[in-house]
């Protein structure tokens, strides 16, 4: 396996970076471009930007900030938000993004995954999955339109089945957003990650729950994920990226410089 990746996640709403808890009650974290530059300078391996209300608002991500981010950072970045067509993805990639991620639009039209992979290559196509553990049924369920709590809905897919399906259709990477853990900083859902890791033959990125450095270590060493995505611990300065990388190296995790 290649070196593991540390990936700050920047949720974008109304032109600024926000962060919620379990996808609700978002507070402003700062401006997009300065935060992106800060993380690149601190040693992040990659950045992910989610325009969290684009799909629920039936629009495509605002491209004006995509080009500004591309001008100030020299690490790969991925953009998500309402991408419903090859043309939508093409424009975002032309503005400077290295990858595009689709989530709700893929659930609406699974064939879109294949169309994008055929046009741009699987290495450019990430599928985000918002997974919710239903304690009543004991199942992991995929949710859609999670950027707007009034429109969020449970889909017909269980998370394991959707993970298998998106790989068949050409997903080059999967970001597993674990909704129950999101923003509460109690650790990634290692049980879910191990379950999905066994089904996932493409790079798997853990998202939701990081609160301490050991949580990153456990995601890499116990669940064998390729990357760990986090937001609030980076936005609020709880975990500095250089210190996190030094810790992980010391714990035997192969990490990029």
Curated annotation (Swiss-Prot):
Q: Where located?
A: Cytoplasm
GO annotations under biological process?
L-histidine biosynthetic process
At the top level, the lineage of the source is Bacteria
User: What would be one Gene Ontology cellular-component term for the protein?
Assistant: cytoplasm
Disulfide-bond pairs as recorded: none
Kindly list any coiled-coil regions of this protein: none
InterPro entries under this entry? Aldolase_TIM, His_biosynth, HisF, IGPS_HisA/HisF, RibuloseP-bd_barrel
Q: Which SUPFAM superfamilies match?
A: Ribulose-phoshate binding barrel (SSF51366)
State the UniProt keywords alphabetically: Amino-acid biosynthesis, Cytoplasm, Histidine biosynthesis, Lyase
Which EC numbers does the record give?
A: 4.3.2.10
- Which EC class does it fall in? lyase
Which transformation does this protein catalyse, written as a reaction?
5-[(5-phospho-1-deoxy-D-ribulos-1-ylimino)methylamino]-1-(5-phospho-beta-D-ribosyl)imidazole-4-carboxamide + L-glutamine = D-erythro-1-(imidazol-4-yl)glycerol 3-phosphate + 5-amino-1-(5-phospho-beta-D-ribosyl)imidazole-4-carboxamide + L-glutamate + H(+)
Instruction: Tell me the active site.
Output: 11, 130
Q: In which pathway does it act?
A: Amino-acid biosynthesis; L-histidine biosynthesis; L-histidine from 5-phospho-alpha-D-ribose 1-diphosphate: step 5/9
List all membrane-crossing ranges.
Answer: none
Please give the PANTHER family that the UniProt record associates with this protein: IMIDAZOLE GLYCEROL PHOSPHATE SYNTHASE HISHF, IMIDAZOLE GLYCEROL PHOSPHATE SYNTHASE SUBUNIT HISF/H IGP SYNTHASE SUBUNIT HISF/H
Q: How would you summarize the oligomeric state and partners of this protein? A: Heterodimer of HisH and HisF.
Function of the molecule: IGPS catalyzes the conversion of PRFAR and glutamine to IGP, AICAR and glutamate. The HisF subunit catalyzes the cyclization activity that produces IGP and AICAR from PRFAR using the ammonia provided by the HisH subunit.
Q: Of which family is this protein a member? A: Belongs to the HisA/HisF family.
> By what name is this protein known?
Imidazole glycerol phosphate synthase subunit HisF
Instruction: List the lineage, top down.
Output: Bacteria, Pseudomonadati, Pseudomonadota, Gammaproteobacteria, Aeromonadales
Gene name, Swiss-Prot/TrEMBL:
hisF
């Amino acid at each position: 396996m290649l070196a593991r990746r540390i990936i700050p996640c920047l949720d974008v709403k109304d032109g600024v970076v926000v962060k919620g808890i379990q996808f609700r009650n978002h507070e402003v974290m700062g401006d997009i471009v300065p935060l992106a530059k800060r993380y690149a300078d601190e040693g992040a391996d990659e950045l992910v930007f989610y325009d969290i209300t684009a799909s629920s608002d039936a629009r495509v991500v605002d491209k004006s900030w995509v080009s500004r981010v591309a001008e100030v950072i020299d690490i790969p970045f991925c953009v998500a938000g309402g991408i419903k067509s090859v043309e939508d993805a093409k424009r975002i990639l032309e503005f400077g993004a290295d990858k595009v991620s689709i989530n709700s639009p893929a659930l609406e039209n699974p064939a879109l995954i294949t169309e994008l992979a055929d046009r741009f290559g699987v290495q450019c196509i990430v599928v985000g999955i918002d997974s919710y553990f239903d304690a009543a049924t004991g199942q992991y369920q995929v949710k859609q339109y999670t950027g707007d709590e009034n429109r969020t809905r449970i889909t017909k897919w269980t998370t394991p089945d959707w993970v298998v399906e998106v790989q068949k259709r050409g997903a080059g990477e999967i970001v597993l957003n674990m909704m129950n853990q999101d923003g509460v900083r109690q650790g990634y859902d290692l049980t879910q990650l191990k379950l999905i890791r066994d089904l996932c033959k493409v790079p798997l990125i853990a998202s939701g729950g990081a609160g301490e450095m050991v949580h990153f270590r456990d995601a890499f060493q116990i669940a064998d994920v390729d990357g760990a995505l986090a937001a609030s611990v980076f936005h609020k300065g709880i975990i500095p990226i250089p210190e996190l990388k030094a810790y992980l190296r010391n714990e035997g995790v192969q990490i990029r410089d």
